[in-house]
Amino acid sequence: MDDKELLRKLAKKNLRACQLKQLEILKVIDGICKRNGIQYWLDSGTLLGAVRHGGFIPWDDDIDIVMPLGDLRRFERVAAKELPDGLFLQTTKTDPSAKEPIVKVRDLQSLYIEGGDNFVTPYKKGIYVDIFPFVAYPDLAPGLFHKVIPIISKSNSILHHFHRYSLRAFAEFFWFGAKLCAGWLMWGLLSLYPKKNRMGTAPLVNGTGNTHRRSSIFPLTTIRFEDSVFPAPADTDAYLRDLFGDYMQIPPADKRQVHAVYINPDLSR
């Protein structure tokens, strides 16, 4: 057994402890949002898990939620004051070397390592909950966004990935820099159209270009996830079909993979 496979086995062994720690982080976020009138809802695999499994997808090791952009900015301001000791609001401002422009609430007493992580830059690497910004999208055919938006998100991700100096890295900088500029230009042109009926994750962190009708999101409802109830979109069926198609279909065993390559849920032990 090679080192990578050994780490994967350890990650799976610690999966449930990781999930429970993420659930506790989510409960803290939920409390802050309720006290401050901040809207959010379960998204992506977390919402899918709630609908299909009543909680975590058994092999999933992350929690995703979304907030309208204005609510996320408010959350960043209040969370800096209200998060308890041991939790850290990770943004590009609070942790400039973070590998992604995604807001996360991280647990500082754990370690969660993914494939793209590095130990050259000192960003926080604890177990976390992802918080994605939701924005209005132009009232255009959804297929357009599937073509344009991944150009932005994937180019930006590659540009901000850790690179060692090399001719290839130099070439990637110019190639993906040009693609990122082209993607933003196309988004700017699309944004000239009215934005009344569709919303989605902000282009910079929307890897697929998926969007949703506002009517499938609002008014928010609630759904049980593990031992608690959290906000959810109004029409979970339509919302999940936008993301996954036939979302009730269980993937084959070889597709049920955790994201992490190493998980230590408690560094104090």
Model-derived regions, located:
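Conserved catalytic core of two-metal-ion nucleotidyltransferases
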Residues: 2-36, 79-138, 159-164, 168-245, ...
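Short, surface-exposed, charged/polar-biased interaction segments
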Residues: 61, 68, 96, 152, ...
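Active-site nucleotide-donor binding segment shared across nucleotidyl transfer reactions
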Residues: 30-63, 67, 72-73, 242
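Short amphipathic alpha-helical patches
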Residues: 56-57, 71, 155, 263-268
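N-terminal beta-rich core of secreted/periplasmic extracellular enzymes
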Residues: 139, 151-158
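A short secondary-structure junction signal
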Residues: 140-147
